[in-house]
């Protein structure tokens, strides 16, 4: 065979090998994409429904009776974050398998970071017990309440709550999720002794706000500083429904691009305690209502260790953070949705849609 013919044959083989390689890589990409898709976590509503059913199935009759409430029960709105007597079924009465199912339910309602915060807050109760010796300080005094009947296409809700923790979810039509009020608190805000010394469960919420405050120029700071004295607690407390607070603070539109980025990062810190789908929905609503309508306000001292409070408020939402009690080592923080706490906006849309059709399936 002549050298020119040999060269031509080799070129043909080279082209065929390249084609086979390209085809194989393409198949691999498709395969990996398929695997990634099939391994994606289920949507929050579906995940919560599945894990709630599994959790309820683990309970005995007495526990299930304590955990279940009608969807239209007034108890659904009776949320709080202080160490008080609560309804529901507590971790304290659960077996190890029941506890595992209960915490799986919490995982389904929060992001990984949100779940870590919730568990860290619960474990702080052990530190308080060691400091105070009071039985009310107990990491097992966290309660579960289920409102209505979890199921595909159903409207129902649930709450996970104890000292410094209140997470409230409403699932409408088995698909839409509302996840507020959302409360996280810490005492101590910074652990100063023992094996967990230096732990600051809500440290990012404070540090980023301080970074924003420190970046303000004199004019911006004059708008942002609402008072030299911080309130003793978040202003909305545990109210069932909240309206906008005074429209005060420095406006997002008056911030530089780098300051706006810090402000948005703080908002994300609170929003992303929820699963990605819910968090993105929250953030989309914030954007749609207009970023320039958001204001940041500060009360109290600007130095670390001084009592302080801040809030971030837009047309649809309110973030409050207060650290005044316990020598400014005791944090309360909350995300409120003016229209959507306890799923009010989702339920209103649902009822309007079905006003002349079938009644809502709330598992009654």
Residue ranges and their predicted role:
Residues 15-26:
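Bacterial N-terminal signal peptides that target proteins for export
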Residues 25-34:
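Bacterial N-terminal signal peptides
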């Amino acid at each position: 065979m002549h050298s020119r013919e040999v060269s031509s044959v080799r070129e043909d083989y080279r082209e065929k090998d390249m084609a086979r390689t390209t085809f194989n890589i393409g198949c691999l990409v498709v395969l990996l994409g398929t695997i990634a898709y099939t391994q994606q976590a289920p949507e929050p509503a579906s995940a919560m429904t599945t894990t709630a059913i599994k959790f309820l199935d683990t309970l005995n009759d007495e526990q299930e009776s304590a955990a279940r409430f009608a969807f239209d029960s007034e108890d659904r709105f009776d949320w709080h974050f202080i160490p008080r007597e609560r309804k529901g079924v507590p971790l304290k009465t659960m077996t190890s398998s029941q506890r595992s199912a209960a915490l799986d339910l919490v995982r389904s309602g929060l992001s990984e970071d949100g779940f870590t915060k919730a568990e860290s807050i619960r474990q702080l109760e052990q530190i308080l017990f060691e400091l105070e010796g009071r039985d009310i300080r107990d990491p097992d005094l966290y309660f579960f309440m289920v409102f209505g009947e979890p199921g595909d296409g159903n409207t129902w809700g649930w709450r996970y709550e104890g000292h410094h923790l209140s997470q409230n979810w409403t699932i409408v039509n088995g698909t839409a999720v509302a996840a507020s009020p959302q409360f996280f608190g810490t005492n101590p805000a910074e652990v100063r002794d023992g094996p967990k010394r230096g732990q600051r469960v809500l440290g990012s919420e404070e540090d980023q706000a301080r970074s924003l405050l420190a970046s303000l120029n004199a004019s911006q700071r004059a708008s942002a500083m609402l008072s030299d004295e911080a309130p003793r607690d978040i202003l909305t407390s545990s109210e069932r429904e909240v309206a906008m607070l005074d429209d005060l603070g420095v406006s997002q539109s008056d911030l530089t691009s780098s300051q706006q980025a810090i402000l948005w990062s703080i908002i994300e810190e609170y929003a992303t305690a929820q699963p990605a789908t819910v968090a993105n929905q929250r953030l989309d609503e914030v954007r749609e209502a207009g970023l320039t309508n958001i204001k940041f306000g500060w009360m109290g001292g600007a130095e670390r260790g001084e009592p302080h409070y801040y809030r971030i408020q837009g047309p649809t939402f309110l973030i409050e953070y207060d650290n005044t009690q316990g020598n400014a080592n005791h944090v309360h923080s909350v995300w409120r949705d003016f229209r959507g706490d306890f799923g009010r906006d989702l339920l209103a849309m649902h009822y309007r849609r079905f006003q002349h059709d079938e009644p809502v399936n709330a598992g009654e």
